[in-house]
Swiss-Prot record:
HAMAP family xref list: INFV_NCAP (MF_04070)
Pfam families, per database record: Flu_NP
Motif annotated as Unconventional nuclear localization signal, chain positions: 1-18
Post-translational modification: Late in virus-infected cells, may be cleaved from a 56-kDa protein to a 53-kDa protein by a cellular caspase. This cleavage might be a marker for the onset of apoptosis in infected cells or have a specific function in virus host interaction.
InterPro entries: Flu_NP (IPR002141)
Species of the source: Influenza A virus (strain A/Goose/Guangdong/1/1996 H5N1 genotype Gs/Gd)
Role, per record: Encapsidates the negative strand viral RNA, protecting it from nucleases. The encapsidated genomic RNA is termed the ribonucleoprotein (RNP) and serves as template for transcription and replication. The RNP needs to be localized in the host nucleus to start an infectious cycle, but is too large to diffuse through the nuclear pore complex. NP comprises at least 2 nuclear localization signals that are responsible for the active RNP import into the nucleus through cellular importin alpha/beta pathway.
Assembly: Homomultimerizes to form the nucleocapsid. May bind host exportin-1/XPO1. Binds to viral genomic RNA. Protein-RNA contacts are mediated by a combination of electrostatic interactions between positively charged residues and the phosphate backbone and planar interactions between aromatic side chains and bases.
Name recorded for this polypeptide: Nucleoprotein
Family that this chain belongs to: Belongs to the influenza viruses nucleoprotein family.
Region of interest (Disordered), residue spans: 1-21
Amino acid sequence: MASQGTKRSYEQMETGGERQNATEIRASVGRMVGGIGRFYIQMCTELKLSDYEGRLIQNSITIERMVLSAFDERRNKYLEEHPSAGKDPKKTGGPIYRRRDGKWVRELILYDKEEIRRIWRQANNGEDATAGLTHMMIWHSNLNDATYQRTRALVRTGMDPRMCSLMQGSTLPRRSGAAGAAVKGVGTMVMELIRMIKRGINDRNFWRGENGRRTRIAYERMCNILKGKFQTAAQRAMMDQVRESRNPGNAEIEDLIFLARSALILRGSVAHKSCLPACVYGLAVASGYDFEREGYSLVGIDPFRLLQNSQVFSLIRPNENPAHKSQLVWMACHSAAFEDLRVSSFIRGTRVAPRGQLSTRGVQIASNENMETMDSSTLELRSRYWAIRTRSGGNTNQQRASAGQISVQPTFSVQRNLPFERATIMAAFTGNTEGRTSDMRTEIIRMMESSRPEDVSFQGRGVFELSDEKATNPIVPSFDMSNEGSYFFGDNAEEYDN
């Protein structure tokens, strides 16, 4: 990792702040989530939601999506210039679920975007509070990561579906800023770059003219973000090659896919943040909690503590398992879709099952689903322990390279081995080491071959009791070393389609 001195912490990225000390960071992150909470309470009042309805995660998601859409400048402008039938560019809305005579009913609501913006600004001391908007985008992104497998998107860009552990943040919108870039996985960045290069190959004018100049700047910026995620000199050098290419084409795509594969073992630094649904912050604010005064952190005990004391409900379809639905949302709340299930299970205190064993579909309910048979249940979002979220790839003892597993990008800073099938991964690296990047490729392959699955990552790091807020007594769990736990193995999760 680059020394902390040159980087802003995630919270600073998230709150758009310059370098601040720990107390100031906690206060500004607190201000951000407090603003989300105040906005949520106001929206519940506007919509006349009962306490129970306000705690329904589906209602929370609709309200979050409305404010995100109200502030989506680019799309708003596009909608005004390309009026489509039946879409009012000045309005936003979605399904709100209400309890009527012992049944859940869906009501489609519509609001002026201007009105939503006014309520949002009012809840955020008159400011646009972009950080709070980004925070909600990351929560939606984490929910998508836990719910869907991006096999189709991977295959479309020529990558291997087994690389799904590199796809964190793949559904984040472009406008998610530095905080969004920090949580994107290596595969996500590679996919964005490949899409861009493919457009350049198919469209002669993509890199030309005034627009092309802007495109080029965006391309180089994305390359630099990806380069910053890699932790070995050879991987970074290859990124320089890709960035400096005069006319990016198939050679660059090859290099990027090679780099993505290498990240299965030589993992990149990807930030993890616990972003909770707006209703959770709303509940806390309503109960009189002052986030700004108390301070808040996305990577410490605070989100765990908040979830210990929040009761959130979810609609449940007839053949879904409420415990499985809870696991899905728990994983989303802690951005743990690509964490080792052994670690997640230990922290949560109940077994966390792979996606393929869950009897649950996504959290959102489609407009054509029958509400007659819908039930609701409490989401169990509490945990047994808490642990610090990591932004490193968990590479072992400074050897800049380490064991990975097809399918883990650690979320929690907790000691474990990262088992992987070296044969499976290395099989993808046969052949092609010629060309301009040959020495770098050789070096990367050498590092991968020398990594051992039994090496321990996050040496000495443990989990903490929920009463231990200063993290004084780490409890280092012992895991069955042979039994790796990856969420998307043997899987039949639905695809994410925009």
